[in-house]
Amino acid sequence: MAAGPIIAGPIIAGRAGRLKIAVLISGGGSNLQSLIDHFGPGVAASPIEIVLVLSNRADAYGLQRATAAGLPVKVIEHRGFPDRAAFDAALDGALRAAGAELVVLAGFMRLLTPGFIEAWHDRLVNIHPALLPSFRGLDTHRRALKRGVKVHGCTVHFVRAEMDTGPIIAQAVVPVEAEDTPESLGVRVLAAEHKLYPAALRLIADGCVTVEQDRAVVRSAPANAVPLFSPPLKAD
């Protein structure tokens, strides 16, 4: 697979018009729906255009969400390929044919090959249901509760070959409640994801994100942010 250009400085430096994104899904597509609500057809002054919704599963409900919104959809079943590299080559071809500038993973349940990730270096983002670098991988809510952390949350990051290790773009913090179960905590984290992902993509589209020494820097971050305490501190 031929590698695309390695982007230096702002992720969208020199780009004219709206940022063209492709969204990759495998299931229900609730994060996709949030992106549709923020950037879909008919959204006034959107800095982002969704040029393709692609799934590796024909039965993914997210495809229905995309079709209802009038978005282009495509299915590439991974089971029809002899290996991961062949599947990723087909994926790469579809993304480039659609004119995608940024690839957005939204519940895409396939590990991508290092060659694909390098081809889309700093043009491939994911959202993870934990505050990275803590709780990489699966089953994050149960593991967070088992460790007794007082805050949990979600992270938007650029993708690297090692899972859940890429430069962190944005995070949302969700306080953990004493009676939380993995399910109840997961509901609140997912609600935070639906707000965080569109906000992070807008930062990229607006040219606010750079990658410097494999660290994502966001120039629009407010100064003197107020710390969050969990449990909340009692008033003096």
Predicted feature residues:
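Short, structured coil segments at secondary-structure junctions
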Residues: 69-70, 120
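Residue-level detector of anion-binding/catalytic polar loops
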Residues: 72, 101, 150
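N-terminal glycine-rich "phosphate-gripper" loop used for MgATP/nucleotide binding
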Residues: 55-57, 79-80, 84-85, 98-114
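An anion-binding loop in the catalytic cleft
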Residues: 2-20, 43-47, 75, 195-236
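Donor/substrate-binding cores of folate-linked one-carbon enzymes
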Residues: 38, 106-219
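Short beta->alpha connector loops at strand-helix junctions that form conserved
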Residues: 74-79, 127
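N-terminal Rossmann-like dinucleotide-binding module
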Residues: 2-61, 65
